[in-house]
Structure formats: C-alpha cells, structure tokens
Amino acid sequence: MQSSTLRQILLITDGCSNKGTDPAAMAALAREQGITVNVIGVMENDTIDESGMREIEAIAAAGGGVSQIVYSQALSQTVQMVTRKAMTTTIQGVVNKELKQILGRNSSIEELPPDKRGEIVEVVDELSEISELEVLVLVDTSASMKHKLPTVKESLIDLSISLNARIGNNRFSVFIFPGKKNDVEKLLDWTPKLDSLSKIFSKLTPGGITPTGPALSEALRYFEKKRSLRSMLGNDEQYYEDSI
C-alpha cells in the first residue's frame, strides 16, 4: 500500500459560533472531500459553554475527526495527540476499506487473527510515519480567546516540531477568525515549520464574533485552490479518501 497525503483541519476554539453557515455542515462537506476536521475546545476556569461543547463534538463527528475539551495548560500535548490520532484513524479506515475489497464486506482489522492483525497494525504505524501531512489550523481569535492565544501559539510550534520528527513531509497553514476586515484571515501560508508564529501572534488583536462556519468554508476553498494549482502544474497528488 502506497503512502499518500493526509489532509486535516485543526479548529481551536473556546465557544459557540454566532455568525454564518452551520459549521457541522461545512465539516461534513470537508469529510466528503477527504479532509478530516479535528476540534479542540479550550476551557477556562473549569468551564466551557454547554452549547459550545455540543457544537465542538458535532463538528468533529461530522468531519470524521477527533474532538477534545481541554484546559489551556494541557493544550500542547492535546494538539499533538489529536493530530496523530486522526492520522491513524484515517489510515485505519483506508486499510479496512482495502481489506473489505480483498476479503469481503464484513472484514476489518479487528476481525483478523492476532498475527495478521499485528502485521496490519505495523503497516498503519509505518504509513503514519511516512505519509505526507497537510494541516490547516483555524484559530478562534474572538474576544474570549485573548488570554489563551500565547498558549495556542506555543502549542502549534510544539506540534510542528513533533511532527517534523516523522519521515513524511509536513505542511502547515494558519488562519484566524474573525480577521481584521473579513470573517477569516490567512495568517501563514503553507510552510513546514511554525516558528514564525511567535512574531505574528504578538501582533494579533483578539475581539469580535465567532464565525466558525465561514472559517471552515474558507479552509475548504484554500485546500481546493492548492489542489487545483498542483493539478494545473501536472503535479497532482494522491489523497487518502475518508473511509471511516
């Protein structure tokens, strides 16, 4: 089985969206396009709004990804865990799909004999190590996120360091919502490292509403733009299709 490119959206927020399209619907659209949507809800003072929590879970479920509610001080390890878990889940889904084609509709990794299952798990681990990864990060910069942004910045830098220890190539892009003039603003174009976030984040002025749906919509457009450009240049890539 050949390695392909894993595509993820990582949404970091602390509450409920209050403008624009339904974010869960946009996450479902992302899943249809082979993009996994992971959501991390950042808590403060032991609480997170109940409607916000429901929305976080709904977005991740619709996007075939992982959701996690976390205190800001545990954000760094959570960002890494969620990203890696989603990678493994996507690859397992693809492997299960291939097993069904080879062995029949009811076959899956869990139903294989222990020795064969061990071999498949090794394949999944290897693919997680060598597959290319594209992560588009959406950071909520509404007013309530003001004191959490320094932690978000450090967590994303730690994420790029951790993932760059893999063999496979990584590309990250960072968008914020709301932006200065629009609902969404690109902060950082595709790059293998996120070190430059230190300077960029220090200039951010959090405030305003939480247009999560429009932010996800813009993320999809950005992925499609990248894919179209590669196709036009004759360098189209293989992408993992969501098979979960």
Tell where the protein language model's regions lie, with residue ranges.
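VWA/integrin I-like adhesion module and closely mimicked acidic/polar interface patches used
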Residues: Q2-L6, T13-A62, V70, Y240
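Von Willebrand factor
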Residues: Q8-I12, I130-D189
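Second-shell loop/turn segments in exported
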Residues: C16, S142, K146, S202-P206
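Short beta-strand-loop
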Residues: T47-E57, R171-K203, Y222-F223, S228-M232
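Short acidic-hydrophobic, aromatic-tinged amphipathic segments that line or gate anion-handling sites
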Residues: V66-L75
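Acidic, polar low-complexity linker/tail segments
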Residues: M81-L136, A143-K148
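Phosphate/oxyanion-binding active-site loops and adjacent basic polyanion-contact surfaces
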Residues: K148-V152, G208-L220
